[in-house]
């Protein structure tokens, strides 16, 4: 059915537009040249963004895209794609208060629930902190981001090459080496 990551996004996107979905979800499509991240936002609507070549994504169980270029998604589709009626959906439901083609879908479609601060944002924070320990201040009163931050970056350029062992460590994390370690 598909021969590339881009085709995967378009194929799943067309199925979502036709059949819809009950809940929000995300899925990555990868080929030898690029990676795309698609998020369903409920109903028959979806958005997708290409992961920059030099970047990584830490994605817990919540919507994560933090920047979205609607103009590119609806026309050129160089870095972004979405369901055909996304602009109308956003306008009709008053989901973008910036009135700009470049908006934050996490704010428009995502959640900022207390449960996110227990189950989701801490996992993203730990991974970002692990892969970029010096890029940002991750702890303390003057931290750029904390485990409860709702504005964690969706993607970042790592400070060093990420290894399989690094990924295993982050995926098995219980926040070891931080004040948030429950053990």
Regions found by a protein language model. Give the residues of each.
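C-terminus-biased signal that marks the final domain/tail of proteins
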Residues: 9, 13, 20, 32-35, ...
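Structured, non-membrane catalytic/scaffold regions adjacent to prosthetic-group chemistry
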Residues: 1-51, 55-60, 152-158, 162-165
């Amino acid at each position: 059915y598909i021969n590339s990551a881009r085709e995967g996004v378009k194929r799943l996107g067309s199925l979502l537009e036709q059949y819809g979905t009950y809940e929000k979800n995300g899925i990555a499509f990868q080929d030898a040249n690029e990676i795309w991240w698609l998020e369903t936002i409920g109903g028959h609507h979806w958005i997708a963004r290409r992961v920059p070549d030099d970047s990584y994504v830490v994605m817990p169980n919540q919507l994560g895209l933090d920047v979205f270029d609607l103009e590119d998604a609806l026309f050129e589709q160089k870095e972004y794609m979405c369901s055909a009626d996304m602009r109308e959906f956003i306008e009709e439901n008053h989901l973008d208060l910036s009135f700009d083609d470049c908006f934050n879908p996490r704010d428009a479609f995502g959640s900022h629930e207390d449960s996110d601060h227990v189950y989701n944002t801490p996992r993203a924070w730990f991974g970002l902190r692990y892969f970029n320990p010096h890029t940002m201040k991750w702890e303390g009163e003057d931290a750029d981001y904390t485990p409860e931050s709702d504005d964690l970056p969706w993607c970042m350029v790592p400070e060093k090459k990420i290894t399989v062992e690094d990924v295993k460590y982050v995926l098995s994390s219980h926040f070891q080496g931080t004040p948030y370690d429950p053990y």
